[in-house]
Amino acid sequence: MSRRLIYVLNINRKSTHKIQENEIYTYFSYCNIDHTSTELDFVVKNYDLNRRQPVTGYTALHCYLYNNYFTNDVLKVLLNHGVDVTIKPSSGHMPIYILLTRCCNISHNVVIDMINKDKTHLSHKDYSNLLLEYIKSRYMLLKEEDIDENIVSTLLDKGIDPNFKQDGYTALHYYYLCLAHVYKPGECRKPITIKKAKRIISLFIQHGANLNALDNCGNTPFHLYLSIEMCNNIHMTKMLLTFNPNFEICNNHGLTPILCYITSDYIQHDILVMLIHHYETNVGEMPIDERRMIVFEFIKTYSTRPLDSITYLMNRFKNIDIHTRYEGKTLLHIACEYNNTHVIDYLIRINGDINALTDNNKHAIQLIIDNKENSQYTIDCLLYILRYIVDKNVIRSLVDQLPYLPIFDIKSFEKFISYCILLDDTFYDRHVQNRDSKTYRYTFSKYISFDKYDSIITKCYEETILLKLSTVLDTTLYSVLRCHNSRKLKRYLSVLKKYNNDKSFKIYSNIMNERYLNVYYKDMYVSKVYDKLFPVFTDKKCLLTLLPSEIIYEILYMLTIYDLYNISYPPTKV
């Protein structure tokens, strides 16, 4: 839709009549001016363009540079009719400053014209922040505006110091922030090509820019780039690494660039691998404290491929294992505390001890409950690790805290209750004893009504009675579901499959299915590994031939499904 022109001037007046200042202010500040218009021609010939307003000190040039309908063509007309580009208004900002920080779609040619009209060299203190403010404006205000490579080159060639600091930042700090935010969801920024970004950074370096300059928080530009959540592009990051930023500089929080990335709340596996590889190739072996911190901080963070990343880190840093502690906690403690189920699963596969206590005697379950920031995932994470908990005292302690657990999904909570009743024989009896207590009832008021809670427990308990009455060979279905030994459960596999389809079990069907699948896959992979290693077991030169096959099966059952899978299908090395 075309804009309607606003006419505020009477161009038919006699040339001897004075144009009022408020007319000029309105005209240049708010009107959509056509550079070929009779109006503009009338104004530039009949008005002193360098007359300053009493309060603001603005001239016609200042007013037009703040006009939302700014065009390069009108600015050229003003420059050709002798506007003074050196006049400072009360704000203290020179016209070239306003042009570079306020105007959109500015032409490199008008920038050169304005600079050439000013005889002062750009190295003068009045212009020292010009390049920094130009790039800063594209980062903070004019987000859809491009950073013109030619303008950057001209400003640097004219003597602007690329290392000038304002509020601790250099122009490169702001440029790296622009590069990071281009990829941030919802920013709607103009894309910056990698080739262009590389040329601009090269221009800075050619003019003596310090690539590792520190801001007030001790961050280099590369620190800032890596710390922006959800915005790092692998190809852009790879390009920035070609300038060999210093990986050993710690900011005021003790974080190197890699640690800034690890703590950014969003990690791409490929970028993590690239950063570590670059460090080890160009710097050398990473200090043990930094390695430890990388692994522990990674577990707290969202990542695109958590299993791949934790496997890579554990294999890369050989002196960090499941027993390593940082601030009194093992890797598994941190994984539980931050509800990182992918990492929990991996660490338990490689024999991490879920029942180990922290240095201040806290169990993993307590760490999950205490982390209020992740309260919406508390129940799901507790459900996830309950399959690994066998200590009855730990389960009883968890049951005692049930009234205080945050409930966001009633189905997950119901499943959680069913696990607790299955694993703790005393749960239902203790609940019945306290049922009439007002204090006990009141503790449930925050997340769920007591009646709802009581009905869930009653339903679960009634179904456990049915489990106890259901015979499975020489035992009951109740005992089978409480058993964690997949070797023992193998003999009940076919019965579990039958009960798995039994519609009479509405609450415990999920647990039956989990038990069945766990035993099924364990048995399947044990058989695969046994068949694969059979030539070894039967080789007369091998001492394993002395062992009965039953013992070999027992040994294989000690391995996790993950281990058995990797033996059956070894990962291919690229």
UniProtKB/Swiss-Prot annotation:
Residues 541-574 form the F-box domain. It holds the Pfam family PRANC. InterPro entries: Ank_repeat_dom-contain_49, Ankyrin_rpt, Ankyrin_rpt-contain_sf, F-box_dom, PRANC_domain. It comes from Variola virus (isolate Human/India/Ind3/1967) (VARV). It comes from the Viruses. ANK repeats lie at residues 56-87, 135-164, 167-213, 217-249, 253-285, 327-356. This is Ankyrin repeat protein B18. Keywords: ANK repeat, Repeat.
